[in-house]
Structures are given as C-alpha cells and as structure tokens.
C-alpha cells in the first residue's frame, strides 16, 4: 500500500497498476485484506485507461468490503471518465458505507458533486460543498484541494459562490510559504487569487521560486 501511494504521488500510472498486478496471484478472497489489494489494482487499471477491467475489479472489491473507500473511488473514476453521470450518482448514493470514518470521504463526496456539476445541478453541488465537502471547515491539504477545485469549476461556469473562497484561502494560508508540492500550491493559488489575497499569492510565488532553486 505504501508503494501504491508512492506511485500515486509520483504520477506513475504504469506502476500503480503493475506493482499490484505482480503480487495479485499470491492473494485470494480467503486472505484478509484481499479487497484492499483489488481496490488498489482497480485504481491502477483505471489510471492506465483500462476502464472495463478497472470497473469490474473495483466493484468486486466493494462487494467484498462495502466500506473500502479506495475501491469505491476507483469505480467513481471510471464512471466519471466515461461520462456515465447517472450511473456515477447511483454508484455513490447507493453505498453509504464509504461515507463513514474515512480520510477519503470528502474526496468521494467531491466525485459525487462532479457528476451533479456535469448535469448543471448547481444547487445540489453547492449543497454538497456546504455540507460534507467543506461544511466542517477542514484544514487537511487533500480536503482543501477538493474545496478549491470545486469552487473553481463552479466559477468557470458562471456560478456565484459568494464568500466561500475567503474561508478556503484562510485555511490555505498556513501552508502558503511551504513550497513543497506544486499541486497543492496551485490549488492554494486559486483560493488566494479568487479571494483577493494578493499578499498570500505573492508569498506563495516566492516560496515556489525558493523551492525551484534548491
């Protein structure tokens, strides 16, 4: 699992699939944790473009362990990539087990919101944002990424998001000078720019310059 996460953060789609594929023959449904291996394999297949196989494996993992949020997430990716919006909503709504006690819960709610966004059901998207996505005002970077990217998508579609950017920017502020991970910084920059916090945006840009020179 640690290797799978490393492959994810380095963007190595081939190894996301193949690292798990190599050990899969040594696993079976009689071995505890088999569902987790299938969930990782499903995500690797999806990221490699093998949507049919990825969906099948992901659904099998969830059937074995309904609260496997990573397997749920892998199938959500497939349905999103294929534009299967109604099926995506049904998939996420039909299994409430992923919503409980998981660091991935907010991100999975975000995936559900994307399906509603494609339907231009902005009222539901904003309700999801104000509820399970950002209602708890979380400060984890992975949750702030989801908040920023969803507000950005809404704004690009001309939706008035009110003052929601302000709170997101305030929570990103503690990480503005880190300059450690460009993906995070880009999402922080969205919040700073859209909330008018040019001071934080300047600090973020300077942190990026320092990091690039190291």
Question: Where do the protein language model's features map onto the residues?
Answer:
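Generic helix N-cap/helix-start motif at coil->alpha-helix transitions
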Residues: 1, 30-38, 66-73, 101-109, ...
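Long all-alpha helical scaffold domains
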Residues: 51, 65-76, 84-111, 126
């Amino acid at each position: 699992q640690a290797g799978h996460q490393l492959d994810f953060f380095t963007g190595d789609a081939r190894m996301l699939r193949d690292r798990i594929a190599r050990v899969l023959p040594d696993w079976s449904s009689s071995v505890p944790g088999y569902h987790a291996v299938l969930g990782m394999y499903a995500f690797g297949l999806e990221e490699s473009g093998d949507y049919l196989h990825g969906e099948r494996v992901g659904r099998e993992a969830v059937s074995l362990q309904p609260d496997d949020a990573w397997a749920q997430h892998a199938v959500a990716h497939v349905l999103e990539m294929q534009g299967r919006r109604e099926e995506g909503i049904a998939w996420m709504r039909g299994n409430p087990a992923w919503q409980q006690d998981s660091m991935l819960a907010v991100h999975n709610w975000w995936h559900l919101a994307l399906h509603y966004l494609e339907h231009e059901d902005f009222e539901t998207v904003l309700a999801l944002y104000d509820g399970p996505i950002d209602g708890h005002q979380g400060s984890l970077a992975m949750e702030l990424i989801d908040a920023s990217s969803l507000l950005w998508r809404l704004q690009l579609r001309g939706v008035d998001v009110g003052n929601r950017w302000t709170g997101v920017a305030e929570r990103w502020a503690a990480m503005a000078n880190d300059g450690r991970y460009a993906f995070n910084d880009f999402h922080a920059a969205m919040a700073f720019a859209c909330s008018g916090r040019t001071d934080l945006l300047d600090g973020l840009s300077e942190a990026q310059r320092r990091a690039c020179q190291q």
